[in-house]
Regions:
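PRPP-associated nucleotide enzymes
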Residues: 1-310
């Protein structure tokens, strides 16, 4: 087993490498003057099982192309098999046609990764579980729920807790954390007038005098989560904590969160955004390297990955 890192999140790659006690493959990733990406593997990998770690985060197009070219380079270097470890699977939010003439980018990206030569994919908290079905190769979708549950049990002292889905689509995710914490569930009913905007219509469930934990997979502009937190406070919630796997945090998201009613936002390090959040006192980052490293180890040893979540 050998590991190679793309440029999207070298900090996470180094943590996973340290966890597995395996050095990263020596490689060169450069750009030509016109922006074309050039990748070269600088050591012999013939006959090895290779795990490439690369998030499809901002700049999403460059990082996706880097992933595809790296898979191709590994394939042409006679790797035995290639596992694409994609902590944050970008383009996953376009998983279906929401208008008559739109693309389904999640399916296209799945096709590209497979066609490039990947034999397996490992990712964390896919935006929609059915994206696994877009691939014709095995996909291991890891869950951050155990990490969040351990943190919440230590961090939140209240005995009157309820988990909240910020929209109907996130119900299963919130229910999973609620089950781990042995608490109930509420749902924020919202509509989205246009991308990046959300409007709360109703809150299903009693949140009065309760400590609310909003659970979601992605926080981008922050609008959905901030509006949900406001709605909960308006309906009598005592305080609002937020647990989200992927901190995209576009534009002014961090500033908006700092000024919001959110007591604490907890994200993982699937996306490298330390520079964005270093001055935000109410944003905390949990490491995902242990979970991902253990999954890689189990795949390499042909043992169960799903047992991690039992």
């Amino acid at each position: 087993m050998k590991i190679i890192s793309g440029n999207s999140n070298k900090t996470l790659s180094n943590k996973i490498s340290k966890f597995l006690k395996s050095k990263l493959i020596n490689s060169s990733i450069k750009k030509f003057s016109d922006g074309e990406i050039y990748i070269e593997i600088n050591e012999n990998i013939r006959g090895n099982s290779i795990f490439i770690i690369q998030s499809i985060s901002s700049p999403a197009n460059d990082n996706l192309m880097e992933l595809l070219l790296c898979i191709d380079a590994l394939k042409r270097s006679s790797a035995k098999n290639i596992t694409a470890v994609i902590p944050y699977f970008g383009y996953a939010r376009q998983d279906r046609k929401v208008a008559p003439r739109t693309s389904i980018s999640a399916k296209l990206v799945s096709n590209l990764i497979t066609k490039a030569g990947a034999d397996r994919v490992v990712t964390v908290d896919l935006h929609a579980g059915q994206i696994q079905g877009f691939f014709d190769i095995p996909v291991d979708n890891l869950f951050s729920t155990p990490i969040f549950a351990r943190h919440a049990k230590k961090k939140i002292k209240s005995k009157n807790i309820i988990c909240v889905a910020p929209d109907v689509g996130g119900t299963e995710r919130a229910r999973a954390l609620g089950k781990a914490l042995n608490v109930g569930l509420a749902i924020v009913d919202k509509r989205r007038p246009k991308p990046g905007q959300s409007q709360v219509m109703n809150v299903i469930g009693n949140v009065k005098d309760k400590t609310c934990i909003i659970v979601d997979d992605i926080i981008d502009s922050g609008g959905t989560i901030i509006n949900a937190a406001k709605a909960l406070k308006t309906r009598g919630a005592k305080e609002v904590y937020v647990y989200i796997t992927h901190g995209v945090l576009s534009g002014e998201a961090v500033e908006k969160i700092k000024k919001s009613v959110i007591k604490n936002l907890v994200i993982t390090d699937t996306i490298d955004n330390q520079d964005k959040i270093k001055k935000a006192k109410n944003i905390e980052v949990l490491p995902i390297s242990g979970l991902m490293g253990e999954a890689i180890k189990r795949i390499s040893n042909s043992t169960s990955v799903s047992d991690l979540f039992k």
